[in-house]
Amino acid sequence: MRLERLNYNKIKIFLTFDDLSERGLTKEDLWRNAPKVQQLFRDMMQEANKELGFEADGPIAVEVFSLQAQGMVVIVTKENQEMDTDDEFRDEFIEMQVTLDESEHILYEFATLDDVINLSNRLYNLGVTGGKLYTWDERFYLWVEEEEQIQLLKADFIAILAEYGNPSTATIYRIMEYGKELMDVNAIEQIHNYFVKKQNLS
């Protein structure tokens, strides 16, 4: 579970599928307002209070986004409405706004350009050449669409990506808006040709 404060009344929580399975939950369970799901959100709010000082001292709205093969992003917004602190975690104050984003595209973030180069070299040798490369907030982001993954099984593709980076908790729309596009087509092939192939020829 990774937490990030977006502003004074909004936080973002990234849950991996392992986080869910440890609690006996599946992705599909989040679309239901079951007791185990309510307990998950209570746990998340307690963790947010501990790590970020984010107190659920009023009604909260919860938006859930499913990232294909990566996990879940949960956006929690604290509404500006007074309430009794004894009711802090009462279920009626949790407004579920489930947004199902079942995009088959994959977005990963990387700490350094070297991570992207090493990943691209490995993927290129496996026949993967597509993708778009972005940079934002001193990190690099590789966006790969579904039709560009056909050379590998999705599970294998994700496993390789995970060796070099992490699933992005930012959406592609946020990165497009605030970041900079470095390569708009065949990023993996371009990186391989420029950084790996060129180096080998020198």
Swiss-Prot record:
It comes from the Bacteria. The keyword Cytoplasm does not apply. InterPro entries: MecA_C_sf, Neg-reg_MecA. One of its GO terms (biological process) is establishment of competence for transformation. One of its GO terms (molecular function) is protein-macromolecule adaptor activity. Keywords: Competence, Sporulation. The keyword ATP-binding does not apply. Enables the recognition and targeting of unfolded and aggregated proteins to the ClpC protease or to other proteins involved in proteolysis. Acts negatively in the development of competence by binding ComK and recruiting it to the ClpCP protease. When overexpressed, inhibits sporulation. Also involved in Spx degradation by ClpC. The N-terminal domain has binding sites for ComK and probably for unfolded/aggregated proteins; the C-terminal domain interacts with ClpC. NCBIfam families: PRK02899.1. Belongs to the MecA family. Homodimer. This is Adapter protein MecA 2. It comes from Bacillus cereus (strain ATCC 14579 / DSM 31 / CCUG 7414 / JCM 2152 / NBRC 15305 / NCIMB 9373 / NCTC 2599 / NRRL B-3711). The lineage of its organism: Bacteria, Bacillati, Bacillota, Bacilli, Bacillales. The gene is mecA2.
